[in-house]
Amino acid sequence: MIKNQIEYYEEASRCFNPLKHFQMRTQEMENKSNYGVRTASKWNEIVGQYLKDEIYPVVHPIGQETFSLYAVFPTGIFEYALDIDGATALIKKEGINPTIFNPTQIIASVDEGNINKDLNNIKTNHKNPVMILQSQRLMGNMPHCINGNHRIFEAHRNNEKSIEVYHFKDLEFVPFFYDDLSKAMYYLEMDFNNVINDKRDFLKDPYGAFADAF
């Protein structure tokens, strides 16, 4: 992703209308199947009770490290807000272990637009570890670095053999969402995919839905 794309996503995401997106998704689910009708009903209730007054885009707190992950939908570009400091706290609390990667395996996860290649202007900040998300729903299963872009880039450029990375897949990173709207959007898209494709991915109950987890 080049820099002007990042700037475009940031600007375009401000125009996104979450309530319109929820309405369109639930209508499509209702038209698909009885399961879709039940799932859409749950989401309409969630929107009415919890989400209709949510502020979007979310206000990122001063002094707290967060990350914006942008997703492109037919309704526009949505900003998922991730709490990097919170993710680090969870890693420590749960005793989660990193995975060892060769930098060549994960260099594609780095956003070129987030890399400052002028070594004199790089401000070192290693208070949080290198983290990568890999989500079928958010990124088509392509890994995406949410913290530590420069460390991966430098390790790759210096031909280092290994780097420690905290690697999170679908559902594992739900606690990282900074706001309820980001969490709801993620769960909504999981349900939408299952309804439209007549699947039950990541669900134990064939009659359940991710709306129940919200």
Write out the residue ranges for each language-model feature.
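Basic- and aromatic-enriched surface patches that contact anionic nucleotides/nucleic acids
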Residues: 1-25, 31, 138-214
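Short alpha-helix boundary/capping and kink motifs at helix termini
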Residues: 2-144, 156
